[in-house]
Amino acid sequence: MSSDAEMAIFGEAAPYLRKPEKERIEAQNRPFDSKKACFVADNKEMYVKGMIQTRENDKVIVKTLDDRMLTLNNDQVFPMNPPKFDKIEDMAMMTHLHEPAVLYNLKERYAAWMIYTYSGLFCVTVNPYKWLPVYKPEVVAAYRGKKRQEAPPHIFSISDNAYQFMLTDRDNQSILITGESGAGKTVNTKRVIQYFATIAVTGDKKKETQPGKMQGTLEDQIIQANPLLEAFGNAKTVRNDNSSRFGKFIRIHFGATGKLASADIETYLLEKSRVTFQLSSERSYHIFYQIMSNKKPELIDLLLISTNPFDFPFVSQGEVTVASIDDSEELLATDNAIDILGFSSEEKVGIYKLTGAVMHYGNMKFKQKQREEQAEPDGTEVADKAGYLMGLNSAEMLKGLCCPRVKVGNEYVTKGQNVQQVTNSVGALAKAVYEKMFLWMVTRINQQLDTKQPRQYFIGVLDIAGFEIFDFNSLEQLCINFTNEKLQQFFNHHMFVLEQEEYKKEGIEWEFIDFGMDLAACIELIEKPMGIFSILEEECMFPKATDTSFKNKLYDQHLGKSNNFQKPKPAKGKAEAHFSLVHYAGTVDYNIAGWLDKNKDPLNETVVGLYQKSSLKLLSFLFSNYAGAETGDSGGSKKGGKKKGSSFQTVSAVFRENLNKLMTNLRSTHPHFVRCLIPNETKTPGVMDHYLVMHQLRCNGVLEGIRICRKGFPSRILYADFKQRYRILNASAIPEGQFIDSKNASEKLLNSIDVDREQFRFGNTKVFFKAGLLGLLEEMRDEKLVTLMTSTQAVCRGYLMRVEFKKMMERRDSIFCIQYNIRSFMNVKHWPWMNLFFKIKPLLKSAEAEKEMATMKEDFERTKEELARSEARRKELEEKMVSLLQEKNDLQLQVQSETENLMDAEERCEGLIKSKILLEAKVKELTERLEEEEEMNSELVAKKRNLEDKCSSLKRDIDDLELTLTKVEKEKHATENKVKNLSEEMTALEENISKLTKEKKSLQEAHQQTLDDLQVEEDKVNGLIKINAKLEQQTDDLEGSLEQEKKLRADLERAKRKLEGDLKMSQESIMDLENDKQQIEEKLKKKEFELSQLQAKIDDEQVHSLQFQKKIKELQARIEELEEEIEAEHTLRAKIEKQRSDLARELEEISERLEEASGATSAQIEMNKKREAEFQKMRRDLEEATLQHEATAATLRKKQADSVAELGEQIDNLQRVKQKLEKEKSELKMEIDDMASNIEALSKSKSNIERTCRTVEDQFSEIKAKDEQQTQLIHDLNMQKARLQTQNGELSHRVEEKESLISQLTKSKQALTQQLEELKRQMEEETKAKNAMAHALQSSRHDCDLLREQYEEEQEAKAELQRALSKANSEVAQWRTKYETDAIQRTEELEEAKKKLAQRLQEAEENTETANSKCASLEKTKQRLQGEVEDLMRDLERSHTACATLDKKQRNFDKVLAEWKQKLDESQAELEAAQKESRSLSTELFKMRNAYEEVVDQLETLRRENKNLQEEISDLTEQIAETGKNLQEAEKTKKLVEQEKSDLQVALEEVEGSLEHEESKILRVQLELSQVKSELDRKVIEKDEEIEQLKRNSQRAAEALQSVLDAEIRSRNDALRLKKKMEGDLNEMEIQLGHSNRQMAETQKHLRTVQGQLKDSQLHLDDALRSNEDLKEQLAIVERRNGLLLEELEEMKVALEQTERTRRLSEQELLDASDRVQLLHSQNTSLINTKKKLEADIAQCQAEVENSIQESRNAEEKAKKAITDAAMMAEELKKEQDTSAHLERMKKNLEQTVKDLQHRLDEAEQLALKGGKKQIQKLENRVRELENELDVEQKRGAEALKGAHKYERKVKEMTYQAEEDHKNILRLQDLVDKLQAKVKSYKRQAEEAEEQANTQLSRCRRVQHELEEAAERADIAESQVNKLRAKSRDVGSQKMEE
C-alpha cells in the first residue's frame, strides 16, 4: 500500500482512488471483536451489520446497528472481516469471502467514490452517475508502466496490464467490458481508447491537410471516432441517457516496439427500428436532435427542416431532450470528428442530407383512393424535400412507393399498395438508408485508421449493448441478450472450465469445482437446429408465414420441453408477450410481432432502383451492391450458387455469423474482463440498491471468480521463458558447464528461492503460480537487477578511472622530462661552447637543405605525373558513377514495385486467411446440415416403404371419393337455394347498417387474405418441392442410387395429403355450412327483435335525460339563490353581534329547504333504479346474444380456415370441386361478416347508452349525498353556536373576578419583594466575604506550590552541576592517560585541554556555590509561607463562624416563607380551576367557528360542483340526442316518456313547495336562538357556584400543604446541622489533600534525583567502558592506573545496582502516588464543578422566578445544598477508599524495600498492615452500602425531575392552546394570557415545592444516620492513613540517608 506522498502523482484524483494513509492506520487500530461482529440476513436491506449476543444450539441472537434483536439460524449469520480489510482494493484478499462482505466492500468504496475494485483476476466498476476527476492526463501518466499491485484499481491499470502482457507475452489481448444497459460500458471503452492513444503514440504528425485525406494524427482519429459513432449509434433509453444501440469491437494494432500502428472497428446489430419508433421514455439517435439544436444554422437551411423535433414524427414519439446531454455542443464535437477523420466535404454534406431525408420520410402522408384499395400521396411537398436531399425525382419516388413493380414469373407487373403497406415501405426504406449510411461510415473510418504501417499485435476492446429487459422486448432485444449470454458463457468457460481443464492437462493435482455457471441450455435453445433462430429462418422461407404460425411452432417445439422456454403470465398495464426466456440475468418476456418482416428485411425494390441511380453519390454508392429480385437472377447466372445463397441470408443469419466471428476473435486473444454494475434504477449518485447489485454479482460470476482466483493458479509461464527471465534470481542454482532441461532448471531455481511451496505448482510444460506470487518474483528480479547494475557500474567506473589515472601518470612523466630538459638547457645556455654550437649548427644544415631541395624537385615531378594519371582515372570513374547511379535508380524503382506487390500479397493473404476462417465455419455448418439431412433421408426411406403400402389402399379410397363427390354436388345445389333466401332477408337490414360498411370491407379483406393464404399454401408446396429437390440433388452426390426413391416418396406424400384433405374437407364443410345456415337464420330473427326493443329503450332514456336536464337547471337556479343568501350572511357576520339572530334564521331556512329538496329527489332515485334494472336486463340479453354470435363466428372462421388449408393441399386433383365450394364459402362468409358487423354495432350502441345511464345515476347519488352532508353541517353549526354563546358569558363573568383577585395578589407581591431584596443584600455580603476568604486560601496554597516547584528545580540544577563535575573528572582522567601515552606528539594539545578543564572545574564549583545559596534562600521562603498558611487557616475558622450566624438568619426567613406559601397555594388552586374552564370554553368556541367556516366553504364547493354537473349532464344529453338520431324506431315509447314527464313536473312542484316551507323554518330558528341565550345565562350562574366550591377546596389543600411545610422546616434544620459537620469534614479533607500533594511533590522530586543519579551512573559506566578499552590496548604502560580504574569501576557497579533498586522502588511509589493524587484531584475538581454548577443554577432560578416566590426558592436551595453536602460526604468516603487501596499497594512495595534494609521491622509492620486491612475492608463494605443507597436516592430524584419535565410539557401545550385562543377571541386575549402565566408559575412552584419537600424529608432522615456512622468510620480510617503516611515518610528518609 503506497503512502500519501506516492499518491501525490495522481493529483486531485488521489482521494477517489485510494484511502489516505491516516484513514488506513485508523482502520487498523479500530477496536474490533472478531467473535461478535457479523453480517446477518435482512428482508429490507438484504444484509445488515450486527453484533452476536448469544448462541443457543443452532440459533444465534444478534443485535443490529439500529438496536433490533434478531434470532437467526447459523447459516444466516456471516462473520465480518477485520477493519483493515475495509474498502480493500482486491476482494480476493479478504479473510472471509461471502456475499455480504463483497456487497459491503463495494458499497463502502462507492460511498467514498472509489468506483473501481479488483475482484480476483478482473475489475468491477460501479456507475457513479456523476463526473469524477479520475481520467485526467496526470492520472494516465501515473498509471503508465505500473504493475497492478503498485497502483490503485482503475480501468487505466487494466489497460496498461494488457499492453504490457502484449509486449512481454507476444500475444494479442482483448478487454471485455460487460454489464447491463446503463452500467457505464461506453464511458470505460472511451477511457481505454484514450489511454492507448496517449501512451503508445508514434509521434508522427501530418505535414499537410488535403481534402479527403487524414486531417489529424492517428491517435486523434482513434479518439475522435467515438463522438461520431455515438452521434449516429447512441440514444437515450429507459436506463441510460447515452446507451450504445450497436455493438462494437475496436482493434488497436501496435508495431513490434509497442507503438500505435493502426486501428479498425467492427460493429454488430445496429438497432435500426429506433429510426422510426421509440418508446415514450426514450428517444431516437442523438444526431437528429443535434442537428435541430440550431448550433449550425446553415444545416437547418441545407436540410429544409425546422428546429422543433415535434414537426417530425419519426424522432418525436418519446422524449426530445436529455438533461445530461447538451445537443448543441455535441453537434460541434460530431462535426469536428468528421473533419478530423478525413471525410471530404462532399461526403460530409451527403451524410447530413441523408439524415435530413430520413426525418422528412416520417412526414410523408398517403391516402386511399375513392372506391379503390389503392393508396395515393396526400400532398407532394414533403416528398419534394426528401427527393431534393436524396437526389431523386420525387414523382418517380412516389410512384414507386404507391405502385411498385413486382416480378411474377419472367415478367414484371405493377402491384397496388394500400396506405398501410406504403407506410410500412417508407419506414423500411428510412431504416435501410440509415443503417447502410452507418455501416459505410464505419468502413470509411477503418480506411482512415489503416495507416499501412507494419503491425505485430492488437488489443481488442469490446463494447456491446448490455443485457436489456424492457416492457416491450422485440427481436433486437433477443439478439442483444443472446450476445450477452454468449459473452457470459465465454467468461464462465474461460474462468472456470478452461482454467481447471488446463490444470488437469498439465498434471496438477486439482479437484474439479462445478460453479454452476453453465449457460449452454439457453444458448442452444436460441441458436441450435430447431431453436428459435432456426424456426424463425424456416418461417421466413415460406412467403405467407405469419407471427401466429411462428409462435405455434415455437410452442410445439419447446414449450414444456425446455426449462428456459416459458409461457409468459399476462400482466396488467404491460405490452403483450408471446413467450419468455430464462436468461442468466433474469426472465425476459418477448413480443414476436413483426419478427418475420424484421428478419427478412424486405425493401421496395423499385425505390431501391431509384436510389442506385441517384445524383447523390453517397446514396447511389450505398445501394450499388443491393441484391434484390432483379439483381439476384443476373447475379446468380454470373457467380452461380454463391450469389444466390448470399441474397437469401436473413438478418438473424448475418447476426449469428458476425457473432461467431467475434467469439472466434475473442478466443484467439488473452481476455481481460471489466464488469460494470448499476448501483440503482433511479440514476442517483451515491445510492446503492443491495438487491439489484447482488443480482448482478451473482449473474456475472463475481464471487465464483474470486474463489477460483484464490484457490487456483491464475498465472503461468513456460519453463523456458521462466528460466530465461528469472535465472538472474539465483544463477548458481543452474550449473553452467552441463546441459539441463528447462523444467528441471525451473524446479531447481524455485526451490532455491525463499518462496512458499504451496504458492506454485509444476505442470508438464508450464509452472503455475497463485495470485500475487508472480508480482513478488518480479519485485525480487527488479531488486536483483538493481544490485547487479550497481556492481557493474562500479566495475566500469573503476576501469575507466584506472585508465584515466594511467594517462595522468604518463602525462606527469612527460612533464617531468620536459622540465628536466629545460632546466638543463637553462644551465648550459650561457656556456661559450654552447654559443659556438648555436652558430655552427645552422651552417651544417645548409648542405642538407640543398640535398632536400633536390629530392623535393624529384618528388614534385613524380607527383605531377601521378596527378595527370589520377585526373584521367577520375574522369573514367565519374562516367562509371553516372552509369551506376542510373542503374541504382532503376533498381530502387524495381524494389519499390516489389515491395508494393509484397504488400498487396500480404493483404490478399490476410483476406484469404479471413475467408478461410469463414469458409471453415461454413464447412462446419454444412457438414452438420449434411449429417442432419442424411438422418432425415434415412427416415424418409423408411416412410417411403410405409407409403408404398398405403398407396394401394388410397387408390381404392379415391374411387369411393368420386362417388361421394356426386352426392356433394347435389347437396350444394340445395345450399345455393337456401343462400339465396338468406340474401333476400339480409337486404332488409342493409339500410340499418350503412355506417358499418368499412368494417365489412375489412372483413372482405380478411376473406381476400384467406384466398391469399390458399395461394401461400400452394407456394409453400412449391417451395417445399424445390427444397426437397435441392436436398435430393445433394444426396445424389453422396448416394446416386437413392434418387429414384426420393421422387417416388415425394409423389406419394402429395397424393396422400390431397386424398386425406379432400375427404375431410368434403365431409366437414358440408355439415358446417348447413348448421351455420340454420343458426344464422335463428339469430337474425332474435337480433331484429332485440334491436327494436333496444331502440325503444334508448328513446325512453333520451326523454328521461331531457327531463333530468330541466330539473338540474331548476336546481341550479335555486342553488344560485342560496348562494346569494350565504353572501348576505357573510356581510352580516362582519358587522356587530346584534345581527347574529338574523343569520341563524337564514341558515335554518336553508337547512329546511335542503331537507325538502332531498326528500323530493328520492322519487327520482326510485325511478332511476327502475330504469337501471331494465337496462341491466337489456344488457344481459345483448351480452348473451353477442357471446353466442361470437362463438359461432369463431367456430365458422376456424372451420373455414381448416377447410381452406386442406383444400389448398389437394388443389391438383380436386380443382373443380374446390372452385365450387370456394364460391359457396365466400358468399356465406360475406353474409356472416355482415351479420357480425350488425351485432357489433348494436353492442357498441348499447354500451354507450349504459355508460350514459351510469354517469347520470352516479351524479344524482353524489348530489344526494352532498345535500345530506350540508343539512348535517347546518345542524351542527347551530348547536355549536348555542354552546359558544353560553361559554362566552361565563368567561366574561369569571374574568372580572380574576381581575379583582390579581389586584390583591399584586399588592402582597410588592410587600414580599421588598423583604426579599433586603435578605438578598445580606446574603450577598456574607457570601462575598466567604468567597474572599476561600480565594485567599487558594492563592496562598498556590504560592506554596510554586515555591516548592522552584526548590525542586534548584535541586535538579544542583544535580546537573554535580553530573557535569563528575563528567569533567572523567574527561580529565582520559586526557591524563592520553597525555602519558602520546606525551611527545601532543604536548601542546594536552596543555590547552588542561587549561580548558581547569576553567570548567572552576565554573562548576561556582555553580555549586550559587545553587547552595539558592537552596538556603528557598528554605527561608518555605518557612515564611508555612506561617502564612497558618494565618489563613485561622481566617478560615472565623469565616465558618460567620456562616453559622447567616444560617440563623436564614431560619427566620424560612418562617416568613411558609406563611406566604400558604397564601400562594390558596390563590393557585382558584386560578388553576379558572384556567381549565376558560381553556375548555375557548377551544370549544374555536372549534365551533372553524366548523361554521367549513360549512360555508362546503356550500361554495357544492355550488361549483353543481355547475360542473350541469355541464356534464348537458354533454351527456347531447350524446344521447346523437344516439337517438341514429335510431329510427323511437316513436313507440313516446307515450311512456310523456307520462314520466308529467310525474317529474309534479315532483318539481313539490320541491318548490318544500323550499317555501324552509323559509318558514328560518323564523323558528330565530326563536330557538333566543332560548339558547337564556340557557347560556343560566349556565354562567352554575359555573360561578362551581368556582366558589373550587375556592373552598383549594383552601383545604393549602392547609394540608402548610403542615407539610412545617415538617420540611424541621428537616431543614436537621440538614443544616449535617451541613456544618460536612463542611468541617470537607476542611479536613482539603488539609489531607494538601498533605498528599506535598507528599506527591516530594516523591516526584526524589524520583527526579534518582533518575539523575541513574543518568550519572550510566554516563560513568560508558566512560569506564571506554577507558577500559583504552587501558587494555596500553596495558603495559599504565598497569598501575588500570588497577585503580578497575576498583573504581567495581564501586560504580555497586552504586549502580543500589541506585537501580532505589529507582525501581521510587518509580513504583511515584506511580502509586500520582494515581492517588490524580484521583483526589479529579474528585476535588468534580466537587468544585458541581458546587459551582449548583450555585449557578440557584442564581438562575432566583433571576427567573417572580419576586413573590423568592422565599420558596430559598427553601429549595437549602434542600439542594443538603443533598450536595450528602453527596460530597459520600464522594469523600469513596475517595478515602481509593486512597486506602493505593496505600495498600504502596505498602506492598515498601515491604520489599524494608526487607532489604531492616529485617527487624518486618513483623511489626506486617501486624500493623493486617490491622489496617481489616479496618479498610469494613470501611469498603460500608461504603458500598452507602453507594447503593445513594443510587436509590438518585433514581428517585430523577423520577421527580421527570415529573417536573412532564408538567413543563403540559404547560407548553397549554401555552399553545392559549395562542390559538388569542387568534379566535380578541377581546379576552390580554386577560386570559395574564391568568395563564400566573397559574402556570403558581402551579409549577407548588408542585416542585411539594415534591422536593416530601423527598427531602425522607432522604435527610436516612442520610443523617448514615453520615454519622460514616464520619466515625472516616475518623478511624484517617488515623490509620496518618500512621501509614508516617511509616512511609520514615522509610523514605531512611532510604535518603542511605
Swiss-Prot record:
Q: Which Pfam families match?
A: Myosin_head, Myosin_N, Myosin_tail_1
Domain Myosin N-terminal SH3-like, by residue range, is 33-82
Give the coiled coil ranges. 843-1938
Origin: domain of life? Eukaryota
Q: What does this protein do?
A: Fast twitching myosin mediating the high-velocity and low-tension contractions of specific striated muscles.
Q: Which family does it belong to?
A: Belongs to the TRAFAC class myosin-kinesin ATPase superfamily. Myosin family.
What is the protein named? Myosin-13
Q: What is the organism field in this record? A: Homo sapiens (Human)
